[in-house]
From Swiss-Prot:
The keyword GTP-binding applies. This is tRNA modification GTPase MnmE. GO terms for cellular component: cytosol. It comes from Hydrogenovibrio crunogenus (strain DSM 25203 / XCL-2) (Thiomicrospira crunogena). GO terms for biological process: tRNA methylation; tRNA wobble uridine modification. Exhibits a very high intrinsic GTPase hydrolysis rate. Involved in the addition of a carboxymethylaminomethyl (cmnm) group at the wobble position (U34) of certain tRNAs, forming tRNA-cmnm(5)s(2)U34. Gene3D superfamilies: P-loop containing nucleotide triphosphate hydrolases (3.40.50.300), Probable tRNA modification gtpase trme, domain 1 (3.30.1360.120), tRNA modification GTPase MnmE domain 2 (1.20.120.430). Coiled coil: none annotated.
Length: 451
């Protein structure tokens, strides 16, 4: 998608629908000229101006507050005009058409934020944090996104990049001046700096992993034979009657999905049709969808009945589970055998004894899910991150570890310098210092219009 930096762009910046206030945002070289036509004059910079918004014939379209921010002291780094009027869809569309008539064009999704990025008002991680802040599903997620927007994540990445640059300079100097009597590569300084960078990378990666969990959450699929209590567990976790619960086997015939939170971590829980040899066509489709959902899961909860031995059909379900997706075995209905809630681990396999109907042992399950996803209930130092950030950090970590091995085993300065360059490039992709146009297009077009 072509985002021109020479155009003047405009969009309705408030959410669709009716509201007390609606905002039309304008950014670009013609913003001041548009203000003169719509307001009769260009407002004093950064002062609220109250007055009528005028149409082409001088008629009043609306009245409200106008704000003008001259470049470069604006969100986009360009001249920015905001017209804050009444929040009716007809009025806002009327006002937007007037602005377009005066030379602006309709903004693409995320174009205001992209202009801010192109004009160095924020980096790519901060721009993404704007969308994450808007989409935050919990207070923890909002606070983490705000930290990223304020530059916490970017500052740590930039610090790592600077350390890599300084180390590259030192290593390449040692390569370029081999006649020096001192072997700079073996004097311990390079090894010490490499270790320091590795430790810092691990810390940033751990915080980023928490940020990804806050943003994207965990997908959990509940499986089992009919009447194992899958729907009861979904209802217990969600705190409401999301799924129909009866004693009739096969009540759930399609996937029921609930979005819940555990201490701020989003959890996408899917209740599936009971797995069995079904003859009903509708139930067969539900079972097929259940198997499809399994492949997309982060974790699978296989439910069996605590008041009976593992059924051959239960064993068959367990044996069919994909090896790359972790499974937790849930023994439900402990109230029928008067057993206390329990979590046990055997050879890396987790089993939880609970009663979904009576909400016994739910705390064990919730803590287990948080632990398995590596989620820590702390906000200190956690910033919002995306999977692409994790991939970049993991790539940088790989190259620094490889460079460390080149130094320790081969004293290969040239190979170390190249690994450091690759690590630097991977980190620079996070903030946009080294980023393809295709990536920029994908990121900014995912934003809402008006941002």
């Amino acid at each position: 998608m072509d985002f021109s930096t020479n155009d003047t762009i405009a969009a309705i910046a408030t959410a669709p629908g009716r509201g007390g206030v609606g905002i039309v945002r304008v950014s670009g070289i013609k913003a001041a000229e548009i203000a003169e036509h719509v307001l009769g004059k260009c407002p004093k910079p950064r002062y609220a101006h109250y007055g009528p918004f005028l149409g082409a014939e001088g008629q009043v379209l609306d009245q409200g507050i106008a704000l003008f921010f001259p470049n470069p002291h604006s969100f986009t780094g360009e001249n920015v005009l905001e017209l804050q009027g009444h929040g009716g869809p007809v009025i806002l569309q009327w006002l937007l058409e007037r602005v377009v008539q005066l030379g602006a064009r309709l903004a693409e999704p995320g174009e205001f934020s992209k202009q801010a990025f192109l004009n160095d008002k924020l980096d790519l991680a901060q721009a993404e944090a704007i969308a994450d802040l808007i989409d935050a599903s919990s207070q923890q997620a909002a606070r983490s996104a705000l930290r990223s927007l304020q530059g916490d994540f970017s500052n740590q990445v930039n610090e790592l990049v600077e350390q890599l640059i300084q180390l590259r300079i030192y290593v390449e100097a040692a390569i370029d001046f081999p006649e020096e009597e001192i072997d700079f590569l073996s004097d311990g300084k390079v090894a010490g700096q490499l270790q320091h960078i590795l430790e810092q990378l691990h810390r940033v990666l751990a915080s980023a992993q928490q940020g990804v969990l806050l943003r994207e959450g965990m997908s959990v699929v509940i499986l089992g034979r009919p009447n194992a209590g899958k729907s009861s567990l979904l209802n217990a976790l969600s705190g409401r009657e999301s799924a129909i619960v009866t004693d009739i086997a096969g009540t759930t015939r399609d996937i029921v999905k609930e979005e819940i939170q555990i201490d701020g971590m989003p959890l996408h829980v899917l209740d599936t049709a009971g797995l069995r040899e079904a003859t009903d066509a509708v139930e067969q489709i539900g079972i097929q969808r259940a198997w499809a959902a399994i492949e997309e899961a982060d974790r699978i909860l296989v439910m069996v009945q605590a008041n009976e031995a593992i059924h051959p059909e239960d064993q068959a379900i367990l044996e069919k589970m994909p090896s790359h997706i972790p499974v937790t075995l849930i023994h439900n209905k402990i109230d029928l055998i008067e057993k206390s809630p329990e979590l046990s681990e055997n050879d890396g396999e987790t089993e939880i004894w609970l009663s979904a109907k009576h909400h016994l042992g739910l705390d064990l399950l919730k803590q287990h899910l948080k632990t398995e996803m590596g989620y820590a209930q702390t906000e200190e130092g956690v910033f919002m991150a995306r999977k692409r950030h994790l991939e970049a950090l993991e790539t940088a970590l790989h190259f620094v570890e490889t460079g460390q091995q080149q130094l320790e085993h081969f004293a290969a300065g040239e190979l170390l310098a190249e690994d450091l360059r690759q690590a630097q490039q991977a980190l620079s992709e996070i903030t946009g210092q080294f980023t393809s146009d295709d990536l920029l297009g994908r990121i900014f077009t995912s934003f809402c219009i008006g941002k």
